[in-house]
């Protein structure tokens, strides 16, 4: 369960980071 949670958190963080980077560009 923890592994899935961490994996989901990392995936969400990457998505948010990409979105911010895309918006800044």
Swiss-Prot record:
GO terms for biological process: defense response; defense response to Gram-negative bacterium; defense response to Gram-positive bacterium; hemolysis in another organism. Pfam families: Antimicrobial12. Signal peptide: none annotated. Its main location: secreted. GO terms for cellular component: extracellular region. Gill. The keyword Nuclease does not apply. The modification Histidine amide is found at residue 25. InterPro entries: Antimicrobial12. The keyword Secreted applies. It is found in: Secreted. Keywords: Amidation, Antibiotic, Antimicrobial, Cytolysis, Hemolysis, Secreted. Belongs to the pleurocidin family. Has hemolytic activity against human red blood cells. Seems to disrupt the membranes by adopting an alpha helical conformation. May play a significant role in innate host defense. This is Chrysophsin-2. It comes from Pagrus major (Red sea bream).
């Amino acid at each position: 369960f923890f592994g899935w949670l961490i994996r989901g958190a990392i995936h969400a963080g990457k998505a948010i980071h990409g979105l911010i980077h895309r918006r800044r560009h």
